């Protein structure tokens, strides 16, 4: 699909959390690089920079996600980074500074966004009868969002 879209001059974007990236699998990497050759922009969620904390939050390591960001940057593909801000979970100042350091090391980042956690989809979980994984989470205040934007150096990347 991306190949056809790009052939017609259509801008293509991949919005991903990066979890399936497998840099040690040559077949996967070849297919991924073919996709990237037809991708105008990648929007990547970085939930947590610390591998152990990421594992606690998601059940998965983040090494492949960070490797994906680096690989995309090395390929020269424009990159937007998003960070969902959940008070008490993803707002630790030291880890946000480390995230900013990592982002700064990437060559093609055009934009960094802080996405404030919200409960707009909570009704879907309730309707399906599925326990909501963040029952005690609350949206961040405007001040918390502003502080995260400062720590992540959002203004460096006007996108």
Residue ranges and their predicted role:
Residues 1-115, 120:
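Conserved AdoMet/S-adenosylmethionine-binding subsite of the radical SAM
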Residues 101-104, 110, 126-152:
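A structural motif corresponding to the C-terminal lobe/cap of the Radical SAM core domain
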Residues 154-159:
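Radical SAM enzyme core and accessory elements
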């Amino acid at each position: 699909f991306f190949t056809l879209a790009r052939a017609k001059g259509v801008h293509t974007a991949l919005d991903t959390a990066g979890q399936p990236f497998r840099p040690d699998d040559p077949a996967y990497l070849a297919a991924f690089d073919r996709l990237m050759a037809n991708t105008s922009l990648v929007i990547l969620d970085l939930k947590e920079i610390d591998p152990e904390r990421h594992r606690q939050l998601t059940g998965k390591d983040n090494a492949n996600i960070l490797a994906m960001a680096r690989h995309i940057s090395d390929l020269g593909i424009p990159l937007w980074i998003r960070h969902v801000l959940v008070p008490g979970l993803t707002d630790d100042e030291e880890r946000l500074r480390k995230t900013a350091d990592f982002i700064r090391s990437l060559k093609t980042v055009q934009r960094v966004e802080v996405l404030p956690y919200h409960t707009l989809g909570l009704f879907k979980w309730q309707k399906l009868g599925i326990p909501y994984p963040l029952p005690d989470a609350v949206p961040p205040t405007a001040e918390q969002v502003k502080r995260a934007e400062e720590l992540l150096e959002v203004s460096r990347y006007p996108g």
